[in-house]
Every structure is written in structure tokens, then in C-alpha cells.
């Protein structure tokens, strides 16, 4: 998710796509 992306820049890109933005 977007929040995960802010907290984890490393997994942020994958987390954002997998999290659906949130």
C-alpha cells in the first residue's frame, strides 16, 4: 500500500502495487 511505501521505500513499490494504493 501507499503507507507501506512511505514506511518501507525498499518494498514500497511492490507493496503499493500489491496493496492497491492503500
Swiss-Prot record:
GO terms for biological process: defense response. One of its GO terms (cellular component) is membrane. Belongs to the frog skin active peptide (FSAP) family. Plasticin subfamily. It is found in: Secreted; Target cell membrane. Has no antimicrobial activity against Gram-negative bacterium E.coli ATCC 25922, Gram-positive bacterium S.epidermidis ATCC 12228 and against fungus C.albicans ATCC 24433 at concentrations up to 100 uM. Has an anti-inflammatory effect, since it inhibits the production of the pro-inflammatory cytokines TNF-alpha and IL-1 beta. Has high activity of stimulation of insulin release, which may protect the species from being eaten by predators by causing fatal hypoglycemia. Is not cytotoxic to cancer line cells. Does not show hemolysis on mouse erythrocytes. Its main location: secreted. It comes from Phyllomedusa trinitatis (Trinidad leaf frog). Expressed by the skin glands. This is Plasticin-TR. Plasticins have huge conformational plasticity. They can display random coil, alpha-helical, beta-sheet or beta-harpin structures. Exhibits a propensity to self-association and forms helical oligomers in membrane-mimetic environments. Keywords: Amphibian defense peptide, Membrane, Pharmaceutical, Secreted, Target cell membrane, Target membrane.
Amino acid at each position: 500500500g501507499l503507507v507501506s511505501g512511505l514506511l518501507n521505500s525498499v518494498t514500497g513499490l511492490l507493496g503499493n502495487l500489491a496493496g492497491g494504493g492503500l
